[in-house]
Structure formats: C-alpha cells, structure tokens
C-alpha cells in the first residue's frame, strides 16, 4: 500500500465561492488543490449575463492567494427570461463555459430560477448551437413530492425530455445522489455526464439522522439511502468517463447551519481531494482517482488537462473545528475528526 499519491492537478467542476468578504477564504481553499473550477452563479442577485459574469470573475481573481494560477470558469444563471442573445454573448466572452438550470426554489438562492423548462427552450437551442454546456440541478420542487424522491422525479418529468429534444447539447447532471441518476447517465449519449460530491460518496442519510440531527451533513440534493451511496461509489470508481469530480462545496456561516431552520450545504473545499481519496480507498480504487479528478472533467468540457501535479501523503491530521468565513466562521465537513490523507503544501 503506497503512502504517496501523485495526481495530475485536479479541477472542481462545481463549487460555490459566494461573494464579498468571504472570497479570500473560499478562493484560497479551492486554489490550494484545484487548477480550475466551475463557479456557481447563484449569488444575490444572480449572474445572468456576460457582464455580470465578468465582474464576478474579476472579484474572484482579485481574491486569489499570491502567486496562484487558479482559474475560475464562469457560469450563467438561467432564468425564464434568458435569451439566445444572452447565450451567444456569454459564449463569445471566452470565460463563460456553461449555463445553470436551477428549478425555482430547489436550493440556496434559486428563487430567480426557471419556473417551467419549456420557457428556456430557446436558450437551450442557442446553447446547443454555440457549444455551451447545460448544468442541471436535477430536482423537482413541488411540495407533494417527497424530498428523497425529487431527483428521480426530475429525470422522469424533465431531464429525459431535454436530452431527447436537444441531442447535441452537452449536459452535466450535477451532484447526482441516486442509483436512478447513475443509470440514467450510463444509458444516455456521450453528451451527458455527471458530477459526484465527496460527501455523497462518504455518507448516507443515516449519518445525518441516526443518533441526532447533524446539520453539517444537510445538503441539497439531500443524502439518500446507502443503496444509492453504493451506486455512486460504483460509478465514481468505475473508470467511466461520464463521471467526474464536483465538490458542490457550499459554505454557510456556523449560525446559519446550526439553527432551527438551517441552510443546506457542506463545506468541503478545504480538504476536497483528501476526502475523495478516502472514499476511493474504501473501494481499493485509488488507481482510479486521477482519471475521475483530473481527466474526465476537462475532457468532457473540451478543455486541456492541467500539466502540473499534486501529491497526497498518508498522514493523519485533525480537521479544524471551524474555519474563517469573512466576518463569521464555517464548520467544515468532518470538523474535529481525523482524515487519513494530506495534501503536500506549496504546490499551487
């Protein structure tokens, strides 16, 4: 069993950096490991066009640690009013790589999202024409649908129809959480891929609910049964090029998580690759981690792979109880617990 693991530098194909005073902390945590990251656009107000994406990009670049080459890959936030012209202008910018479908009300800051999939068909047609990827938060939001069933319902009611209607559109089914989603992606064309988070590989709903409610495991899409967790582990460690790394690292201040009505999101960027390594090692599949973390994502996006590398060492360390987040603090996943892998510093 090797005590060192060297990988081509990975990228994060789904991350929330937030905005304002927190950026030096969130960008710094992402940049220590990742060469690039797909930046979620669900700010308030959201990132709806190329000009807003450029302004946000400049704020991220200004927050990078000294000497960092971390590259933010920007994303448009689709609304009912997103036009084909918005899509074409964003594609022409060179720095907007995708557009994100949030069903209205599905997750944090999604109130401006899409109320009916049909309303964005003109935008999707333009995206297919210019080669812009569609990123999907795949959950329905109707109150009568159980929260644990919302991903499967989205596949049945919407996603199947979208990929059939727009066969040349590249689609990323983000942060998949169910066996149903794995099977859908496996059966779909080569234009459909999926990201998988570290927390959905490492945990299931028992970890969140048995013995007390653990708010720092609460995320959307919510953790599912262990049979779904096993399906995700199978997919991530299979070597299938359709599955790749996307942390969905989503910081919320401690007081917003530890509350009567707590926010959804797990903060993992501080030790993302270490968490993935632990999940892959559980499956004796560390030899598959590099492809999942460093090859499949850029290949799907049509971007070059990174050329530098990172090294992990087998060394136990304790995750801090909290980390700075602007004027507040964030409780990271596994706070106060031990991780078995550690990133060698000074590699950015």
Swiss-Prot record:
GO cellular component: cytosol
Enzyme nomenclature, EC number: 3.5.2.3
Positions with a binding annotation for substrate: 16-18, 42, 137, 220, 252, 264
Active site: 248
Catalytic activity of the protein: (S)-dihydroorotate + H2O = N-carbamoyl-L-aspartate + H(+)
Binding site for Zn(2+) 2: 100, 137, 175
GO molecular function: dihydroorotase activity; zinc ion binding
GO biological process: 'de novo' pyrimidine nucleobase biosynthetic process; 'de novo' UMP biosynthetic process
Gene3D superfamilies the UniProt entry points to: Metal-dependent hydrolases (3.20.20.140)
Keywords for this protein: Hydrolase, Metal-binding, Pyrimidine biosynthesis, Zinc
Chain positions found as N6-carboxylysine: 100
Pfam families: Amidohydro_1 (PF01979)
Enzyme class: hydrolase
Binding of Zn(2+) 1, residues: 14, 16, 100, 248
Cofactor annotation: Zn(2+)
Pathway: Pyrimidine metabolism; UMP biosynthesis via de novo pathway; (S)-dihydroorotate from bicarbonate: step 3/3
Quaternary context: Homodimer.
Annotated family: Belongs to the metallo-dependent hydrolases superfamily. DHOase family. Class II DHOase subfamily.
Its biological purpose: Catalyzes the reversible cyclization of carbamoyl aspartate to dihydroorotate.
Record's protein name: Dihydroorotase
This protein's encoding gene: pyrC
